[in-house]
Amino acid sequence: MPLFSVAIVTLNEEENLPRTLASVAALVGDSREQVVVVDSGSTDRTVAIAREFGATVIERPWPGFAAQKNFAMAQCTGDWILSLDADEEVSPELQQQMRLVLASQPPTDAFYLKRRNLFLGRWMKYGGYYPDPKLRLFRRRTAKFETPLQFEERPVHEVIAFDGAAATLDFDLIHHAYPTLTNYLEHMDRYSSLGAQILVDKGRVSSSLATFLWHVFWVPRLGFLWNYVFRLGFLDGREGMLLHLYHATYTSWKYAKAWEKARRVSDGVSTPGRRG
């Protein structure tokens, strides 16, 4: 049976981490297997909870999403690594399938996991939010997290670059993404600021009024129409309506903030940075 490691990065995740660690406990039953938690300065009980579950805890300053996940994976010793976010949960069915598949010594080097995104506690089945495949399970040292060059303005949405064949498992990784509207809006505020700064750094902010209106006014509305109507997001009820409405708002925020930052730069006014 191949040995298994789980890698998780954390910051103030005391509400989510117990659920995540409980969901992988059966995957690391061998004493040679491990859960590695890399924490970047939690002020709540995150570190204590990780240790209570028997995880190897490393405290390290925050270098960025991809760099922190690369570091966590580098500490893993298993033949296979499962990389998780602290708000993700391995379903019992997925847990069982992972064990069976890895025991069969598959020819593939990596597996996509279908992610079931929850918004205000409801599974978002439509509007492009499912199955949301993520490459999370792979042989050690065959993969590393890299910021995608084709989506540079999305610096926190890291992907895995790897060499080899990949397959998709049948069951779901449950993503407890946004339990409250406040949580979601704070998240979008932070992400839109990060995205705006990338646009400014790459010189992708136009002074044209037409371009400004296109990105701030029209793109959000067309995106909402596409995802909520044509991709059937309305079938996810009120939660679906709110998710697509506020995601469209995020798009508008990102370009409006980029315009604001670029204007401040041109006026010689510094803009305070913020961490992702």
State what each model feature region is.
Residues P18, D44-F53, E93-L94:
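Acidic helix N-cap motif at the loop->helix transition within catalytic regions
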Residues V47-Q75:
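Conserved donor nucleotide-binding strand/loop of the catalytic core
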Residues R60, L84-A86:
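Catalytic metal- and UDP-sugar-binding loop of GT-A-like glycosyltransferases, i.e.
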Residues N70-M73, S91-V265, S270, R275-G276:
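Catalytic-site signature of metal-activated, phosphate-bearing donor transferases
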Residues S23, L27-D30, V35, D39-A48, ...:
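A conserved acidic beta->alpha catalytic loop
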Residues M1-A25:
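N-proximal low-complexity "stem/linker" segments adjacent to membrane-targeting elements
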Residues I81:
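Short aromatic/hydrophobic "clamp" motif used to bind/position activated sugar donors
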Residues S31, F53-G54, P133, F162:
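Short, structured coil segments at secondary-structure junctions
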